[in-house]
A protein has these predicted regions:
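Terminal amphipathic helices with adjacent charged low-complexity linkers/tails
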Residues: 191-230, 606-622
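C-terminal, non-catalytic interaction/recognition modules in large multi-subunit enzymes and RNPs
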Residues: 11-13, 27-28, 167, 171-182, ...
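Phosphate-binding loop and its immediate beta->loop->alpha context
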Residues: 56-79, 114-116, 139-168, 172, ...
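N-terminal glycine/serine-rich phosphate-binding loop of ATP-dependent small-molecule kinases
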Residues: 1-108, 155, 162, 166-185, ...
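ATP-dependent carbohydrate kinase catalytic cores
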Residues: 71, 77, 215-223, 227, ...
């Protein structure tokens, strides 16, 4: 990014406010703040969020993201946070996700077993929409001319059918060189059970001087389509993520750890080799902090709702099928049309955020999202000529008060927002910009509600016993309506809600995961125990020797009845009762269990978790800042008429204070709408806990 865009960013950085510390140079004679010891950075499509420990204080702020040069916003943020070479930086981002979504990756050549070159197109032969007369197919990441077959073959059990010769390896290397690849993916049939062929071939291909991704090293599991598709996606992302991470590492702004999709972190070198494990790093980071906020307020289970500028991420936390840490996990999922067979936190994402564009389609129907105005030009209220968005609708309705966003990083132009809603109202025949804005909010909240139902009711979890934890810049604006629709008893708006994913990245700790397909009878305890011990050794070897005694190990098994096509994940230990746990899980999921059927363990997984060690926070006095004795009054549109509502700055609200709706609470980087009939109480943890009144 250069020219005017860089200038706008610099101005925004100059305007940003940081909670808890003055980051400007200290005056003559004053003692400057020390460098930040730990920093969490989460880069989204619209904003880059930062939480740092500096001088015993926790500081938090937002900056506009720079999508054309994503490292720029991260480095600006670290400079503002006072990071130096000794600072530990935990970073989650959407760089890998966006590269896959936009298909802006490397020129990849795939090498697989001869006769299986079309596995990426054949897939599972499943139609995502069985009623589509002309179903749309997503093109594979590698075209047919760069999918090459190698003359070798293994049987399903690992026996050699056709041996891979040195002559064949030399021929494959020559053919691959002719395709001029920027990255290479290698995935041979059944190599998970006998990896020698694939390892030899991948080793020879590395002589070409480009990154080589091997399926047997990345995901040594059954299911060739998913395994090879994951490997291709990894190769597709390696050059871009390698350059991005090198830029960060060369900046001298800290010792980086990269947040992965399972919620832990990895060093940059490993993250650059396996970028496919980062595809959900941003959403994953916030879940741990969200669950901690819920438990601090007395709730063991929670629905998380992270509403940012581009998308909404939600998950059910502390449910029946979560791990020992209360976080929902799954082995694989589809990202941007590509199956990814890697451990992830189970986050559901929809294209509905503050920047979601509102428009009327050719049939006269109001559509909101999934397209987003992003950071540039952004919503109309940014004053850059952007389209009408959800944020503009909330500005017109008065739910977003004040004259700036993101803690002062962006000036708010209400006239531009109203003009955009007026144009939309004409297209909708809505009569007024306020009525158009109400329609936009109803549509986007319907999509958010459907997403919350998918991860709760449709997954066998009852939301009525859980709290709704809302975060992100816009999560608090939709909280009351969504909680009421789901019959939930409380909403939790955590401290630093606007940057909770950055806080989650900072607090995430280190995690390593290893898995292996075994296809063993559940009664074969000796073979299962041996495989688990091997995986435990692999996981522990990735931690420093001094850390290994503090690592918490988790063992899981993917199990099925013999003959089934899909598995359920259960705790692996104790092995003697593994089959019993599977039958209980099967009956809970499907309503029946055949306890006489043979039970097969398909894949074993071991995870190692090393909690983060953070500095003790020195709490600031509540009276540090002078605040108004009473709230401001802002104009709003409520129940079809104009009204004036109280607007509170969050710092005005001391513990145990109560605010009754309708009201607006503004924090640096986030806004909370307290609906009529709801009341908010300030919890000792700093969170605001909302509950419906008797009249709601």
């Amino acid at each position: 990014m250069a020219g005017p865009a860089r200038t706008r960013l610099a101005r925004a950085v100059g305007r940003s406010r940081v909670r808890g510390a003055n980051l400007r140079p200290a005056p003559n004679g004053a003692r400057p703040l020390p460098a930040a010891s730990v920093v969490g950075v989460d880069t989204g499509g619209t904003f880059t969020d930062v939480v740092a420990w500096r001088g015993g204080q926790r500081v938090a702020f937002k900056l506009p993201s720079t999508p054309r040069a994503p490292a720029m916003a991260v480095l600006e943020a670290l400079a503002r946070a006072g990071a130096d070479r000794a600072t530990r930086v935990r970073h989650g981002s959407t760089v890998a996700t966006n590269a896959l979504l936009e298909r802006k990756g490397a020129r990849v050549t795939l090498v697989t077993t001869a006769g299986f070159e079309d596995v990426l197109e054949v897939g599972r032969q499943e139609r995502p929409d069985i009623y589509a007369l002309q179903p749309a197919r997503i093109p594979p990441l590698v075209p047919r001319e760069r999918r090459l077959g190698s003359r070798e073959r293994l049987a399903a059990g690992g026996g050699v059918v056709l041996r891979l010769t040195d002559r064949e390896i030399a021929a494959v290397v020559k053919r691959v060189r002719a395709t001029r690849p920027e990255a290479i993916a290698v995935g041979l049939l059944h190599a998970w059970s006998a990896p020698a062929h694939e390892r030899r071939l991948a080793g020879a291909l590395r002589a070409l001087g480009v990154p080589v991704s091997s399926a047997v090293a990345l995901v040594p599991e059954i299911r060739e389509y998913e395994r090879i598709a994951t490997t291709v996606a990894n190769a597709f992302l390696v050059p871009r993520m390698r350059d991005y991470l090198r830029t960060l590492a060369a900046s001298g702004r800290g010792q980086f750890e990269i947040v992965l999709s399972h919620g832990g972190t990895a060093p940059p070198a490993r993250a650059a080799r396996e970028p496919v494990r980062q595809l959900l790093s941003g959403p994953a980071a916030g879940l741990r902090a969200a669950l901690a906020a819920a438990r601090a307020c007395g709730f063991s289970a929670a629905l998380s709702l992270d509403v940012g500028g581009t998308s909404t991420d939600c998950a059910f936390l502390g449910g029946r099928d979560t791990g020992a840490d209360g976080l929902p996990r799954r082995r694989g999922r589809e990202v941007a049309g590509v199956p990814v067979l890697c451990p992830t936190l189970d986050v559901h994402t929809v294209g509905a955020g503050g920047g979601s564009i509102a428009r009327v389609d050719a049939g006269g129907v109001l559509q909101v999202g999934p397209g987003s105005a992003g950071a540039d030009p952004g919503p109309a209220c940014y004053g850059r000529g952007g389209p009408a968005t959800v944020t503009d609708a909330l500005v017109v309705l008065g739910a977003i008060g004040g004259d700036s966003l993101a803690g002062g990083a962006l000036a708010l132009e209400r006239v531009a927002a109203r003009a955009a809603m007026t144009r939309l109202a004409r297209a909708m025949h809505a009569g007024s910009p306020e009525r158009a804005a109400e329609g936009v909010v109803r549509v986007v909240e319907a999509r958010m509600e459907a997403a919350l139902r998918k991860v709760s009711v449709e997954s066998g979890e009852d939301p009525r016993g859980a709290a709704l934890v809302v975060f992100g810049g816009a999560g608090g604006l939709h909280a009351c309506a969504l909680a009421a629709a789901l019959g939930m008893p409380a909403v939790i708006w955590p401290r630093d809600a606007g940057v909770l994913c950055a806080l989650g990245a900072l607090e995430g700790g280190s995690r390593r995961e290893r898995s292996r397909s075994v296809l063993v009878d559940a009664r074969n305890e000796h073979e299962l125990a041996s495989a688990i011990q091997h995986l435990e050794h692999e996981v522990l070897s990735e931690f420093a020797v001094a850390e290994r005694g503090h690592v918490r190990l988790e063992r899981r098994a993917e199990v099925r009845m013999l003959g089934q096509a899909h598995e359920l994940t259960v705790e692996a230990l104790p092995l003697a009762s593994l089959a019993k746990r599977f039958h209980v899980a099967h009956e809970r999921r499907y309503g029946f269990a055949d306890r006489d059927a043979a039970v097969q363990v398909v894949t074993l997984e071991v995870g190692g978790w090393l909690p983060a060690r953070l500095p003790h926070e020195r709490r600031l006095p509540l009276v540090r800042r002078r605040v108004a004795a009473r709230p401001q009054r802002v104009r709003a549109w409520l129940a079809g008429r104009a009204a004036k509502l109280p607007l509170w700055q969050r710092e005005q609200l001391v513990p145990r204070a109560t605010v009754r709706g309708p009201a607006v609470v503004v924090d640096d980087g986030a806004t909370l709408w307290i609906a009529p009939g709801w009341r908010a109480r300030v919890h000792a943890s700093g969170a605001l806990v909302l509950s419906p009144g008797r009249d709601s």
